[in-house]
């Protein structure tokens, strides 16, 4: 889901995975990507929660939403983690304030973009164009 802040991308993504999880009785996880990366970084040196264990756990969750792609501090490390998560998944919803898939590819790389769009053709992505923030009062 791509579009400006406040237009309902996260709300819709949460509603979708909650509905699917409730119907299928399978686990789902909604997490902001910056928060996820902070948790992984905070676990450095913790044998119980290595990067590989985080990635393995996230790979097993049937339905995952990675919220706010592009809001994290982008580094080679964060790109590597994101690549590993997406490379091991099939059903992932991603929300971002970046305007297009080309923007995502330019910020990250083609390999990450390819994995982020796994199983999705160009007609099945959601763009929230021309919408104003729902958080602001409009006069």
Where in this protein do the model-derived segments appear?
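Short basic/glycine-enriched coil/helix segment immediately N-terminal to the Walker B
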Residues: 52-62
